[in-house]
C-alpha cells in the first residue's frame, strides 16, 4: 500500500511553476550533487559579478517534485545576495521558505543547500579565492 505525501501550497507552486530553470552560459560556478537514495540529481549554475554578488542563478534538477521545488526556492533565496550571504543558506531555511517538507523529503532541501555550496566552491576554485566557511562539496 502506497503512502500519500502531502505538500504545502508553496511546494506545489514551486514544483508546478519552478523559477530559474535552465543553464547559464559561461557560469562563474557550477555545483552538481546527487543522492543515490532517491535518484535526485541537482545542478546549480551561478553568475557572480566582480563584487561577489550573485547576478543570476539557474538550476537543472532530475528528481521528484520536492527536489524541483527546493532547487527553485534555493535559487530564489540566493539571487542578488553576496557570495558570503549565499554561503549561509541552510536546508532548514529552504524548508521554512517552502512551508515545510514531509520527513521523507527533507533530504531534498539538503541537496539544494549542498548544490549551492558546491557551485560556490567551484566559483572559489576557478578564481583562486579563499572564502571563509566554504567547505569542499559533499560526495554521496
Which residues are covered by each model-predicted region?
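Flexible, solvent-exposed loop/hinge segments and secondary-structure transition points
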Residues: 26-29, 35, 54, 60
